[in-house]
Swiss-Prot record:
Entry GO CC: chloroplast thylakoid membrane; photosystem II reaction center
Domain of life: Eukaryota
Protein name listed in UniProt: Photosystem II reaction center protein K
Family: Belongs to the PsbK family.
Alphabetical keyword list: Chloroplast, Membrane, Photosynthesis, Photosystem II, Plastid, Reaction center, Thylakoid, Transmembrane, Transmembrane helix
Gene that encodes the chain: psbK
Annotated organism of origin: Ostreococcus tauri
Transmembrane segments: 20-40
UniProt-listed GO biological process terms: photosynthesis
Membrane association type: Single-pass membrane protein
Amino acid sequence: MTQIFLIGRLPEAYAPFDPIVDVLPIIPVLFLLLAFVWQASVSFR
């Protein structure tokens, strides 16, 4: 039961990093968009 709770929420020591952790899953999407913008800038060669 304690393990499930820890997975669901960060421990108290990492509480200041909670906003950063909320943003982390978006980073791969940003890389995908970056690749698209890069290809658009080189005219999809």
